């Protein structure tokens, strides 16, 4: 039987996506990345069809001996590159990781302090997201506008007065590190726990260009495995031997996860090995690129946030585009030119402006993995200028983008010799390996 039209449509859409985002666009979404061909090859395996409720070697299903092995190996590898003692890879996203931690630390009606939304707090930290769904009251710590960060002195006073169950640091618009070591002693002094959401910066932490929150006093760290850490989409939880981790790990199943999408595990393990060998050079290039892009945009007349602080210490760059029509309009205009960014609230925006905020959030981690360096950041800034300031024909700029991408199609910071995979081929299953 030949393919029905519906199936042809599915295949056409999938192919179009692959061609467009893998070969024709500048992918500058700060929460995305790309796996290596090696990691993708193990992502497509029999694990994607299987279940494994519970922890390794303590499953509720049979047939999990290789799942136990790969999950244990992946956790060991992640602990090694993170310099941590505990890892749980069962959360299927960073938000699920947050939910699992928040639920253990507080009951409905309890209070939690979070980094101010202006300093980048993720929606899962707020009443609009996971905290609200769990019935936990969120109170924002004071904002230091000059440093685009938590106001340390005022936050300490608030911690002492409120005595929350826990405090959350980390964010989604995250240019500069939050004050973990400054706040940790005061959090612990009132009997609270310090949670660090490192979803965006985990790859920078294991790459040693961003301080480790666990070494600075955080009790527990949640992450995503697909942002600056370029693995499969998923979440993880780390600690340095805290009792909180044990409590969370006991309740992830059955509270928040049943099966935990086992095909993630070998791909996460492969990415951890890649980052063991290439992570530091990758993270260093990411931060050099973000700084270079910020400076290049500023030189071309854009209002880049954080000038007095050197613009950024992460993979992100934030740009105020109000004078050009706002974040919603400009993000769509850039997409027409095959430049993919997202609109984003800036520190002075009101939360209700989320649909049309002042700014753009730009992330350089994916294009860095394709091999781009500082000189390409200059080119990207020039493309922004052509679209936004010079108002060039977006179709002409799109041609330039596609032409630029022709030289950056191969994933870097990985192992090159794919021929070594041949001996692991599972041809009878028609899988890559």
Swiss-Prot record:
**Required cofactor names:** pyridoxal 5'-phosphate
Q: Where is this site: Plays an important role in substrate specificity?
A: 226
Q: Record's Pfam families? A: SHMT (PF00464)
Q: Where in the cell is it found?
A: Cytoplasm
Alphabetical GO biological process terms? glycine biosynthetic process from serine; tetrahydrofolate interconversion
Query: Record's GO cellular component, any one?
Result: cytoplasm
Cytoplasm listed as a keyword: yes
Q: Which UniProt keywords apply?
A: Amino-acid biosynthesis, Cytoplasm, One-carbon metabolism, Pyridoxal phosphate, Transferase
Q: By its UniProt entry, which InterPro entries does this protein fall under?
A: PyrdxlP-dep_Trfase (IPR015424), PyrdxlP-dep_Trfase_major (IPR015421), PyrdxlP-dep_Trfase_small (IPR015422), Ser_HO-MeTrfase (IPR001085), Ser_HO-MeTrfase-like (IPR049943), Ser_HO-MeTrfase_PLP_BS (IPR019798), SHMT-like_dom (IPR039429)
Q: Which GO terms describe its molecular function?
A: glycine hydroxymethyltransferase activity; pyridoxal phosphate binding
Looking up SUPFAM superfamilies in the UniProt record yields:
PLP-dependent transferases
- Which pathway is recorded for this entry? Amino-acid biosynthesis; glycine biosynthesis; glycine from L-serine: step 1/1
Zinc listed as a keyword: no
- EC number of the protein: 2.1.2.-
Q: Tell me, what does this protein do in biology?
A: Catalyzes the reversible interconversion of serine and glycine with a modified folate serving as the one-carbon carrier. Also exhibits a pteridine-independent aldolase activity toward beta-hydroxyamino acids, producing glycine and aldehydes, via a retro-aldol mechanism.
HAMAP family given in the database record: SHMT
Could you say which protein family the record assigns here?
Belongs to the SHMT family.
Q: How does it assemble?
A: Homodimer.
The name under which this protein is listed is Serine hydroxymethyltransferase
Q: Which organism is it from?
A: Saccharolobus islandicus (strain M.16.27)
Q: What is the lineage of its organism?
A: Archaea, Thermoproteota, Thermoprotei, Sulfolobales, Sulfolobaceae
Gene name? Answer: glyA
């Amino acid at each position: 039987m030949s393919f029905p039209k519906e199936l042809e449509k599915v295949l056409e859409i999938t192919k179009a996506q692959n061609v467009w985002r893998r070969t024709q666009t500048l992918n500058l979404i700060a929460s995305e990345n790309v796996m290596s061909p090696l990691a993708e090859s193990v992502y497509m395996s029999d694990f994607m069809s299987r279940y494994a409720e519970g922890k390794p070697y303590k499953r509720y299903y049979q047939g999990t001996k290789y799942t136990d092995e790969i999950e244990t190996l992946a956790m060991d590898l992640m602990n090694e590159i993170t310099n941590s003692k505990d890892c749980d890879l069962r959360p299927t996203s960073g938000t699920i990781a947050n939910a699992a931690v928040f639920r253990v630390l507080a009951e409905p009606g309890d209070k939690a302090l979070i980094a101010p939304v202006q300093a980048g707090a993720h929606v899962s930290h707020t009443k609009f997201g996971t905290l609200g769904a769990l019935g936990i009251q969120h109170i924002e710590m004071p904002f230091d506008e000059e440093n685009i960060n938590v106001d340390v002195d005022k936050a300490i006073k608030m911690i002492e007065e409120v005595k929350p169950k826990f405090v959350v640091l980390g964010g989604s618009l995250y240019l500069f590190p939050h004050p973990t070591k400054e706040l940790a002693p005061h959090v612990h002094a009132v009997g609270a726990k310090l949670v660090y959401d490192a979803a965006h910066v985990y790859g920078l932490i294991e790459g040693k260009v961003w301080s480790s929150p666990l070494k600075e006093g955080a009790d527990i760290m949640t992450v995503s495995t697909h942002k600056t850490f370029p693995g499969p989409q998923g979440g993880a939880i780390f600690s340095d031997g805290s009792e909180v981790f044990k409590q969370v790990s006991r309740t992830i199943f059955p509270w928040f996860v049943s099966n935990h999408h086992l095909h993630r595990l070998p791909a996460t393990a492969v990415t951890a090995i890649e980052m063991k060998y290439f992570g530091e050079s990758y993270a260093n290039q990411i931060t050099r690129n973000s700084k270079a892009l910020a400076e290049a945009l500023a030189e071309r007349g854009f209002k880049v946030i954080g000038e007095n602080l050197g613009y950024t210490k992460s993979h992100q760059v934030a740009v105020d585009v109000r004078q050009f029509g706002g974040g919603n309009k400009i993000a769509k205009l850039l997409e027409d030119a095959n430049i993919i960014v997202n609109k984003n609230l800036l520190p002075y925006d009101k939360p209700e402006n989320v649909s049309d905020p002042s700014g753009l959030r730009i992330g350089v981690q994916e294009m860095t993995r394709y091999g781009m360096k500082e000189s390409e950041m200059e080119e990207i800034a020039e493309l922004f200028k052509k679209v936004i300031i010079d108002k060039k024909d977006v179709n002409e700029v799109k041609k330039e983008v596609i032409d630029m991408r022709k030289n950056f199609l191969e994933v870097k910071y990985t192992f090159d010799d794919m021929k070594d995979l041949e001996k692991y081929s599972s041809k009878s299953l028609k899988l890559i390996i």
